[in-house]
Amino acid sequence: MHLVKTPVFTLVMINRVLIRLKIIQIVYAYYQNGSKNLDAAEKELFFSLSKAYDLYNYLLMLMIALTNYAQKRIDAAKAKLAPTAEELYPNMKFVENKFISQLEVNRQLMDFISNQKRTWENDEDFVKGLFEKIVASDIYKEYMASSENSYEADRELWRKLYKTFIFNNEELDILSLIHISEPTRLR
């Protein structure tokens, strides 16, 4: 199993703690089950880890989708009949985020996307709503106003956004369950 690697940044990583937790859950279920089928327990463990890996990549894809949505809004504003100076020359810091640029060229993530055929296009309303919450936040405003232009600052923005808007998002939990459990729904 290959994980999407990004320097010093983790989201919902399949780490040792998660693996240990899944093993304990499977062992408990194994002993609670009267048949004691070791092969079934092993299959359940691999299935569970596979779904955690899917969720990890799905959340990485959400960051890319949010950035792409921001770019679409910028493009639409520039294409207006009479755009303002701010619309013609917007602050591009969010859409030119170095961390997201790294994700967009990550071969493992792109392979996952093409193999799983998952996308956020079907949930544009969710992406739009989440983006609007992000733009209204102090985290976003401080980032956009900052003169710091580094990979670390870009990565830190996404760490803060993830903790604030993605980590405990009930609507996202529901969407994730739907998409991860029904792979044919997308595309």
Question: Could you describe each region identified by the protein language model?
Answer:
Residues 2-12:
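Short, Lys/Arg-enriched N-terminal segments with co-localized hydrophobic residues
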Residues 1-2, 178:
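Accessible peptide chain termini
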Residues 178-186:
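Residue-level detector of conserved catalytic or cofactor/ligand-binding positions
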